[in-house]
Amino acid sequence: MYKRKTASIVKRDSSAAGTTSSAMMMKVDSAETSVRSQSYESTPVSMDTSPDPPTPIKSPSNSQSQSQPGQQRSVGSLVLLTQKFVDLVKANEGSIDLKAATKILDVQKRRIYDITNVLEGIGLIDKGRHCSLVRWRGGGFNNAKDQENYDLARSRTNHLKMLEDDLDRQLEYAQRNLRYVMQDPSNRSYAYVTRDDLLDIFGDDSVFTIPNYDEEVDIKRNHYELAVSLDNGSAIDIRLVTNQGKSTTNPHDVDGFFDYHRLDTPSPSTSSHSSEDGNAPACAGNVITDEHGYSCNPGMKDEMKLLENELTAKIIFQNYLSGHSLRRFYPDDPNLENPPLLQLNPPQEDFNFALKSDEGICELFDVQCS
C-alpha cells in the first residue's frame, strides 16, 4: 500500500512532461504488478510449516472426567464414613454422643451432622432430648421379644390378606351371578316390587315411590315440605305407598307423627275403581297435612288419568294385545295372600280329568260306541 501511494504521488508530479510521464506510467504499472504478485505470494511464504503440537481444547466431557475421580473419592469417603459411624453406634449398644463420635472418627462435626440427618430421615436413628445424643432404632431386632412380635404381626397380616382375597373372590362371584340373573330374559318379567312387599319391608314408615330415583330422606318431627322436581321441567310420577289406599298412623306415636289424609294409589288391580270413584283427589300425588306438605304438578291430572286408562286396558285386553304380559306386574304364584286377579284359564292343574284303565276313546269324547 505504501508503494502504491508513492506511485500515485510520482504520477501527479510528472504530469507536465509527456515522454517522462509515459515512462513513469509504465514503471508505476510494473510496480503495481510487482506489488500484487508479492502480496499474493507473501501469504504462503510467511506461513510457518513446522509441525507444532495442537492446542488442547477443553470440553465438558474432559472436565467431567477430570472431576469424576474427585467426586468418586468424596462419595466413597462419605459412604465409608457412614459405615464407620453405624458400626460405632452398634458397638456402643445402639446409642452414642455425636461429640464423642467426632473425636473418635476424627472428622468435622458438619460431616457427622450430615450423616445423622439422612439416617434420621429414613428412620434408622432417633435423636433424644439432646441433639448430640442419637439412638439406633432400625436395621434389626435387639432382643428375642421384638423378633417374636414381628413374626406374630407378620403371620396375622398374612392371615388377614388371605381373608381379604377370599372375600374379594366371593364378592366377585356374587356380582357376576347377580349380573347373570339380571341379564336373563326369563327373569326380567319379575324385576319389580309390589305394594305388599314395600309395606312388609318398611312397616309404618312413609314410602314415596319415584321412578329411577334411589335416595332415602329422613323426615324428623318438624314441619317439613317435601318437593321433588326434574331438571328438564317434565312431569314426574310420585306415589305414596299406603295400605288399601289409606294412610296408617303408628299407634305408638302419640304426637301423630304421620297423620295423612286419604290417598288413593292407583294399582293394576284397583285402577278401574279409582277412575270411577268421584271422591278421589284430583292429583294422585297430593298429600296435604298439618305437619307435612307434599305437592306435585297440578297439570298432570290428565296424564295420570290417561296412564290409568292405558293400564286398565292392558289388564282387560291382555289376550289381544301383542307384546304384553301380566307377568310384568304380578308373578304366577297362586299362593299369594291377596292375589290381584284370579286366574281362570289355563287352570293350575295340568289335567282336570283322567281316563281310567278300562276307559277308551268313547269315554273320552262321550260317544256311544257299539
From Swiss-Prot:
Domain of life: Eukaryota
Residue ranges of the region described as Dimerization: 137-226
Similarity remark: Belongs to the E2F/DP family.
Gene3D superfamilies tied to this protein: 6.10.250.540, Winged helix-like DNA-binding domain superfamily/Winged helix DNA-binding domain
Tissue expression as described in the entry: Ubiquitously expressed in eye disk.
Listed name of the protein: Transcription factor E2F2
GO cellular component terms listed in the entry, alphabetical order: chromatin; DRM complex; Myb complex; nucleus; Rb-E2F complex; RNA polymerase II transcription regulator complex
Annotated region (Disordered), positions in chain: 1-73
DNA-binding residues: 72-137
UniProt biased composition (Polar residues): 31-49
SMART domains xref list: E2F_TDP
Subunit and partners: Forms a heterodimer with Dp. Interacts with Rbf/Rbf1 and Rbf2. Component of the DREAM complex, which is at least composed of Myb, Caf1-55, mip40, mip120, mip130, E2f2, Dp, Rbf, Rbf2, lin-52, HDAC1/Rpd3 and l(3)mbt.
Keywords tagged on the record: DNA-binding, Nucleus, Repressor, Transcription, Transcription regulation
Result of knocking out the encoding gene: Flies show reduced viability, with between 20 to 35% surviving until adult stages and both male and female flies showing significantly reduced fertility. E2f1 and E2f2 double mutants die at the pupal stage during development compared with E2f1 mutants that die earlier at the larval stage, indicating that E2f1 and E2f2 functionally antagonize each other in vivo. According to PubMed:11748144, flies are viable, with males that are fully fertile and females that are partially sterile.
InterPro entries recorded: E2F (IPR015633), E2F-DP_heterodim (IPR037241), E2F_WHTH_DNA-bd_dom (IPR003316), WH-like_DNA-bd_sf (IPR036388), WH_DNA-bd_sf (IPR036390)
UniProt cross-references to Pfam families, sorted A to Z: E2F_TDP
One term of GO molecular function: DNA-binding transcription factor activity, RNA polymerase II-specific
Biased composition (Low complexity): 15-26, 59-73
Its biological purpose: Transcriptional repressor that binds to E2f sites and represses E2f-regulated target genes. Binding to E2f sites requires transcription factor Dp. Acts synergistically with Rbf2 to antagonize E2f1-mediated transcriptional activation. Component of the DREAM complex, a multiprotein complex that can both act as a transcription activator or repressor depending on the context. The DREAM complex is required for recruiting E2f2 at differentiation-specific promoters and for stabilizing E2f2-Rbf complexes during S phase.
Gene of this entry: E2f2
Taxonomic source organism: Drosophila melanogaster
Compartment annotation: Nucleus
Keyword Isomerase recorded: no
Main location: nucleus
One GO BP: G1/S transition of mitotic cell cycle
